């Protein structure tokens, strides 16, 4: 069942989010790391989020598994998350995102474990260990054997989750399935997701992911419009905001590779922006004091000449700037430029939610001129309030919008 938490401390008290086994325990020794769900919730509250609804889909599996086990278990792990058989009319069938049918107050949807589910087997990496520096002093003669240097490398010897070509398609299809549910049933909700890290040698057609990730996403069918050719499972939609790259932050040391996905951070920024400034306002340019690095490190020019600049037209990109790390773009993944600005999509979501609530209050009233006029006034007052805040153009409310509710 969904669990409501209003603070990080509340979540921390309820969930063993930092007890994920790195591998199957051997004897009494057990190495642990944080779960990606816990990391996303932590970043959400650290960046301004005020309230989260947690839907638990099962226990975390060991980060390091036997060869081939991740691919073999992928469909099994995706099933309770995507809830293909869940019916909006049957609460008993609700699991995973199926619970959205009973949570109309939700505005942002995150799937923090999705990349990890679709990733290939993680690798162990070598970590450079430097001997501690010490002042030069005379010591008693000893053998020439170098003293062993011990240093806690934390989780830096674990590579972060990366996807191969098959995993990337699985991630795209799963995210597209969630997007399709929002477009069909929950049009006022927004899906916030981190792009997965590709393998170092990942390429699609003639494009290497490491060289031009924007072109790679286009060739892989991620940034194309949903249609019959891809089964409606592409993610280029006004219902989706993608975030990139993966981040090294002040609290990511308990994750493999000391890197966290950026979706929790982006969701927190969107949440506090809605409360403090208005959901329709852009969060581009927000400084990110907790961020100290990224994978990969993006070059940024701001004049649309680098692959990172092109990527920022469709993806919320975090990169260094002369004043520190900032969120450089606030965009949806939509292929339609009219729906590209993130604030436009969020504004429409707010209007749809208000219209739904107005309709719910009048659901069992007699349809007629009196009811139509009341609904017109309700929506007119709402749109006027948005216009006064600058969400709508026009010199007057009459220029900015019109509302009509009648027999037609």
Cite the ranges covered by each PLM segment.
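Long, structured protein-protein interaction/assembly regions in large complexes
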Residues: 61-185
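Structured, hydrophobic secondary-structure cores that serve as assembly/anchoring elements
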Residues: 1-62, 101-116, 159-408
């Amino acid at each position: 069942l969904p669990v409501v938490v209003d603070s990080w401390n509340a979540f921390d008290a309820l969930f063993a989010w930092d007890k994920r086994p790195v591998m199957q325990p051997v004897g009494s020794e057990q190495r642990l790391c944080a779960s990606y769900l816990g990391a996303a919730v932590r970043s959400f509250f650290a960046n301004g989020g005020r309230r989260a609804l947690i839907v638990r889909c099962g226990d975390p599996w060991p980060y390091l598994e036997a060869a081939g086990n991740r691919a073999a278990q992928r469909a099994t792990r995706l099933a309770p998350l995507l809830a293909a058989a869940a019916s909006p009319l049957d609460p008993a069938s609700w699991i995973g995102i199926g619970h959205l049918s009973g949570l109309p107050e939700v505005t942002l949807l995150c799937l923090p474990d999705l990349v990890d589910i679709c990733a290939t087997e993680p690798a162990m990496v070598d970590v450079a260990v430097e001997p501690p520096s010490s002042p030069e002093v005379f010591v008693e003669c000893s053998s020439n054997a170098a003293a062993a240097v011990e240093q806690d490398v934390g989780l830096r010897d674990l590579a972060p989750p990366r996807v191969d070509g098959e995993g990337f398609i699985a991630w795209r299809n799963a995210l597209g399935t969630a997007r399709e549910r929002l477009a069909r049933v929950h049009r006022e909700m927004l899906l916030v997701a981190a792009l997965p890290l590709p393998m170092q040698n990942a390429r699609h057609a003639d494009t290497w992911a490491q060289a031009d990730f924007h072109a790679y996403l286009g060739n892989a069918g991620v940034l194309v419009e949903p249609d019959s050719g891809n089964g409606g499972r592409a993610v280029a939609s006004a219902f989706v905001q993608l975030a990139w790259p993966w981040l090294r932050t002040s609290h990511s040391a308990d994750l493999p590779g000391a890197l966290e996905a950026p979706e929790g951070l982006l969701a927190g920024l969107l949440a506090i922006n809605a409360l403090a400034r208005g959901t329709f306002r852009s969060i581009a340019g927000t400084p990110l004091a907790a961020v100290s690095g990224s994978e990969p490190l993006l070059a940024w020019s701001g004049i649309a000449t680098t692959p990172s600049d092109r990527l920022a037209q469709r993806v919320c990109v975090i990169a260094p700037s002369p004043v520190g790390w900032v969120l450089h773009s606030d965009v949806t993944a939509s292929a339609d430029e009219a729906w590209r600005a993130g604030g436009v999509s969020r504004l429409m979501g707010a209007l749809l939610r208000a219209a739904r609530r107005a309709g719910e209050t009048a659901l069992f009233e007699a349809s007629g001129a009196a009811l139509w006029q009341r609904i017109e006034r309700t929506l007119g007052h709402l749109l006027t309030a948005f216009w006064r805040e600058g969400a709508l153009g026009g010199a007057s409310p009459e220029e900015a919008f019109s509302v009509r509710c009648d027999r037609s």
